[in-house]
């Protein structure tokens, strides 16, 4: 620990989107190494998102926390489906007990609804395929963003 308090290690408030109202947090997601690369993390995030909207119909945001190495690999956007990934801590990160970068991931309600509609359509169009194949198609289709802007029109 370098002597700074958690508040001193946090990034300035103005660096984050205006998140307010009912905010969902899906907690931690750990997929065993033997189960990775088959689409499970992609599917679980979307399932939690859809169930959260059903349970809490006024939920305006979903936020999470992701560590630097996963951000470097694009996991928050191309797997977890978060369009926003903002630096949260650059230094001592208490949950891991390490000096590292941690990021706040976020998606607002409109983005969640568009993502759910888009992903359901993709699953329906590829009903004969395995989830891992659908995820690869989704990543190609979305690039780095989880939502197709054209669906907003």
Can you describe what each PLM-predicted range is?
Residues 1-83:
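Acyl-donor binding region in acyl/amide transferases
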